[in-house]
């Protein structure tokens, strides 16, 4: 009997059983790429927990959870990896036990140092880096490091009912499965002289493609003054501008909007909205004032959706299967829908 490890080219019998459904879904080669991938996940709040869960279950080789913050009283509301009574512990350390139990085959590690103190050499051990809960300056800096070292970069956050993801994969090559269309002439059903296209779901072909991404800095600094940009502005989701406002709030206050200081934070958010959108050269009314009612705290259902999307994009990028989101994904929990936006210099 041939061992599955030999037949699978590096996938053991135990792994073949564990990842059987995924191997059937996206193929053995894609799963082997996942099993060889190291991922850094920064920020272990509610969104980070969802991303960690999905990546661990997908079967990456290793996941490093980095967070220098302590568990707050409100964290367990959306962070299911943290046990009750963990307030005051480091968030990453408090998440380790449950995270590792999800899949013992994945090497789950913890890092409690501030991401801002990490040298460039730290990031080169990873195939993909995903940031949550980070300032705009950190996001831009790490994205530049990842681009320089050909590391796949992702970032995302959840603010109340709203969430976003962003990816910079540089020049990314992937394969997409396409169903063959067979030309059938003289179809009996349609008459002897009729030609029709018949979709044969049993025949598929793998098509290689390439897509080029821009940096997060370029995506956040779109020049809206050109005629082309003004035309695109009408189709751009307000959530893009909401993200700009919330990242500026995080930079100015060193935290996200808090329900404990709702009145004060709401006033500041409106002022930041006016300043940020004026600086971008767009009308502040593009982001209606009632946005302040829906962007406080992390909501578990929104974390689940955005975390699922972000983890899926990481898996797709590492496995080089299927078209990636280029480059933003915005989720509006009030409307219950999401949209992919490609924003940048072009």
From Swiss-Prot:
Keywords: Acetylation, Ligase, Nucleus, Phosphoprotein, Ubl conjugation pathway. It is found in: Nucleus. The modification N-acetylvaline is found at residue 2. GO terms for molecular function: SUMO activating enzyme activity. Pathway: Protein modification; protein sumoylation. The modification N6-acetyllysine is found at residue 198. Pfam families: ThiF. GO terms for cellular component: cytoplasm; SUMO activating enzyme complex. The modification Phosphoserine is found at residue 12. Gene3D superfamilies: NAD(P)-binding Rossmann-like Domain (3.40.50.720). The keyword Protease does not apply. Its main location: nucleus. The modification N-acetylmethionine is found at residue 1. Coiled coil: none annotated. The keyword Cell division does not apply. One of its GO terms (biological process) is protein sumoylation. Signal peptide: none annotated. Heterodimer of SAE1 and UBA2/SAE2. The heterodimer corresponds to the two domains that are encoded on a single polypeptide chain in ubiquitin-activating enzyme E1. Interacts with UBE2I. Belongs to the ubiquitin-activating E1 family. The heterodimer acts as an E1 ligase for SUMO1, SUMO2, SUMO3, and probably SUMO4. It mediates ATP-dependent activation of SUMO proteins followed by formation of a thioester bond between a SUMO protein and a conserved active site cysteine residue on UBA2/SAE2. This is SUMO-activating enzyme subunit 1. It comes from Bos taurus.
């Amino acid at each position: 009997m041939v061992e599955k490890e030999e037949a699978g080219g590096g996938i053991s019998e135990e792994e073949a059983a564990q990842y059987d459904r995924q191997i059937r879904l996206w193929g053995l080669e894609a799963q082997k790429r996942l099993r060889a991938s190291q991922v850094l996940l920064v920020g272990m709040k509610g969104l980070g927990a969802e991303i960690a869960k999905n990546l661990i279950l997908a079967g990456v080789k290793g996941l490093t959870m980095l967070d220098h913050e302590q568990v707050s009283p409100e964290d367990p509301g959306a962070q299911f990896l943290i046990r009750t009574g963990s307030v005051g512990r480091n968030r990453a350390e408090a998440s380790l036990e449950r995270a590792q139990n999800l899949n013992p085959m994945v090497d789950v590690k913890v890092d409690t140092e501030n991401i801002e103190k990490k040298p460039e050499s730290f990031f080169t051990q990873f195939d993909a880096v995903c940031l949550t809960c980070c300032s705009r300056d950190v996001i831009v800096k790490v994205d530049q490091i990842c681009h320089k070292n050909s590391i796949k970069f992702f970032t995302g956050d959840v603010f109340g009912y709203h969430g976003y993801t962003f990816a910079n994969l540089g020049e990314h090559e992937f394969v997409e499965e396409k169903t063959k269309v067979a030309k059938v002439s003289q179809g009996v059903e349609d008459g002897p002289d009729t030609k029709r296209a018949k979709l044969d779901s049993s025949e598929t072909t793998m098509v290689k493609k390439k897509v080029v991404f821009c940096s997060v800095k370029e995506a956040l600094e779109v020049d809206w003054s050109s005629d082309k940009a003004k035309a695109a502005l009408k189709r751009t989701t307000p959530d893009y501008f909401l993200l700009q406002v919330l990242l500026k709030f995080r930079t100015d206050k060193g935290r996200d909007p808090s329900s404990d200081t709702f009145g004060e934070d709401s006033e500041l958010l409106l002022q930041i909205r006016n300043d940020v959108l004026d600086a971008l050269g767009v009308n502040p009314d593009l982001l209606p004032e009632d946005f302040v009612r829906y962007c406080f705290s992390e909501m578990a259902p929104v974390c689940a959706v955005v975390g699922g999307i972000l983890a899926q994009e990481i898996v797709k990028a590492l496995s080089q299967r299927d078209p990636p989101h280029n480059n933003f994904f915005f989720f509006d929990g009030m409307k219950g829908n999401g949209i992919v936006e490609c924003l940048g210099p072009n």
